[in-house]
Curated annotation (Swiss-Prot):
It comes from Bordetella bronchiseptica (strain ATCC BAA-588 / NCTC 13252 / RB50) (Alcaligenes bronchisepticus). Its EC number is 6.1.1.1. Disulfide bonds: none annotated. This is Tyrosine--tRNA ligase. A motif ('KMSKS' region) lies at residues 238-242. It catalyses: tRNA(Tyr) + L-tyrosine + ATP = L-tyrosyl-tRNA(Tyr) + AMP + diphosphate + H(+). ATP binds at residue 241. Keywords: Aminoacyl-tRNA synthetase, ATP-binding, Cytoplasm, Ligase, Nucleotide-binding, Protein biosynthesis, RNA-binding. One of its GO terms (molecular function) is RNA binding. It is found in: Cytoplasm.
Amino acid sequence: MSHPEAPITPEVEADLAIARRGCDELLVESEFARKLACSRATGVPLRIKLGLDPTAPDIHLGHTVVLNKMRQLQDLGHNVIFLIGDFTSTIGDPSGRNSTRPPLTREQIETNAKTYYAQASLVLDPARTEIRYNSEWCDPLGARGMIQLASRYTVARMMEREDFTRRFKGGVPIAVHEFLYPLLQGYDSVALKADLELGGTDQKFNLLVGRELQKEYGQEQQCILTMPLLVGTDGVEKMSKSKGNYIGISEAPESMFGKLMSISDTLMWRYYELLSFRSLADIAALKAEIDGGRNPRDAKVALAQEIVARFHSPQAAEAALAAFEARFRDGAIPEDMPEVTVGGAPQGILRILREAGLVASGSEAQRNVEQGGVRVNGDRVEDKSLQLSAGTYVVQVGKRKFARVKLVG
């Protein structure tokens, strides 16, 4: 839709502040302010698009960073479009890849898509969310339509993309079909007449292609808003199921609570900024209390309870806290436990115990496991061959020995 000039009122400034919170970039901010102003003046909501490819059946907290932003804009009264990339998933997004991504079959995509929206609905308001599948307009394109779409973008522009440039210079093959992915994602914005598209920072190139294609098709260009990629529980790499540093939103309350309690105090504040629904003023006040001497554990408990309550219930959050505290009732978790980094993930529990200095020998490690004296994130280890993937873990031997172990690949 076309957005004529309208005054930038204090209400518009407040809306803009909500959009800016935690975002990496808002392009072009002046254009988006104009769109917001026109929407308030006319009462016509903006069309806000978020596309996700159902490449895996589960959504983790990293995905919810952009979903949270979508919900904030939804609560301002705008129309949000949750786009499931069932067609583009058959190509595979090359964003951030050092090699060609294996495409999924339609059967895999359909299986994953069934759970995607159900999980996303834990963040978005289902009654006010439009669900679309990009096969609606991509399937009918056919060969002629695909060639016509490809004619609207140049190879030179496509090679401006950092991961394509890196692979080309490194002699790593780039398949022609990978050039089609950003074009099709951009064409989604044309089909939906999007006013704003959301995505992670790794999606910036694709989102900008959407702007360019809308211009090519005679539409007003969408603005783009990118959100940071959430660092996983290991505090090093972005949250990813393949890295083992993720927290799934459908995980059991106790598991979710325990993983959140295992993150570092520094990372906790980033999680507050990107995952909490508390105001920035409330978070700043809480941080000031911690800086003034209050136990950081209190802030971490509050964060864990908020997130567990959101995806389960307040009662489940209380029960998860009680279970967590019960695990350590006989031996309190020390304020400043030693932190150890162990390489070679995935790694066996016996070696981890030795590397962390919790035992003096392999035989001692094995004996402690066999006697039920070893816990990881509060759960008793019963298998001496247990392998832990990359992530951060609170490892306990007996009642008094603790270490925060960061396991890296």
